Amino acid sequence: MTATPAAPHLREDLLTPRFYTTEIEKAARTSLEDQRHTFEAMLGEMQADYNREHFDRKAPLDRLRDLSPEEKEAYESYLVRSCVSEFSGFLLFKELSRRLKQAGRPELGELFQLMARDEARHAGFLNRALVAEGIAIDLPTLSTKRPITWFPLSWVLYSVYLSEKIGYWRYILIDRHLKANPGNNVAPLFDFFEPWCQDENRHGDIFNMLIRCWPQLRRGIRGKLLSRFFLWSVFLTHSLTVCERGNFYRILGMDPALFDAEVMRQTNRTASRAFPWVFDMESSTYLSLRDRIVDTFRQLKQAKGLQKLGLKLRFAGLLLRQFSQPMRATQAGAEGVLA
């Protein structure tokens, strides 16, 4: 899979998704006994496919407003990263669906099949936007040339939950901003962010239900470490990615740092419904450390020699300080103790 000659600025590493697999046999032992009512409701909602008509295959996606070459590059890079990310999610859900059905769990398999449907729809829609830009990505090739990373089931449940919820807040905050500032809506693609975020939110709720099927994942030191590590790592990745893609958010009239901070605040608040612990962002130095981490990250990209070594040490120290910031217990954690 390659970018077309029309887009030489798109690096090949943007086009390489990560594919994750997990403990399928353990996943097949998921007990739905205590979550049966929630599971049935969510399965019914997914089967109803409320967003089926929202992603119109005939919707024009090629009416960009006048953008400078640098702005166009930022927009296209955003499309590629987002498209590949959605397709990677499709591959994970499709594989889980297939393997769970083979393991004799057809209901769970169907739920993952329906989530795979949504991810494929998103990836296809983004791919159409890329084609409108004259960029061709051979998505089917990704399924035959993908690196596979194995994660324990607990890691997949925590990380995918956060990925879906942070995706929801990213899309909904961009959607709200553009509705309040229509002059910054530079591409028709953004008109579809509201139904898009509904899919992300629904998927996150499903993974919250799956986490509750394994109450031991929210108990004691294990629950606190899982909460701390995945909130920190997902937020760190988001901050550094927004830093690298700052031009994209400025095209939309958004301050990248403020956007990043609000996404983290809202995702952290939402995670309190699923995780036993979340970061205490309001009374800690978490966000001010974020600013220093991003600044050091920028300097690292330009530094050489001994200066780079010193910056790496500073960067590592800042990461450790942020990782160690205070957390607060949640009601979800109390439920995990009682479960």
Model regions: which residues?
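Non-heme di-metal
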Residues: 2-339
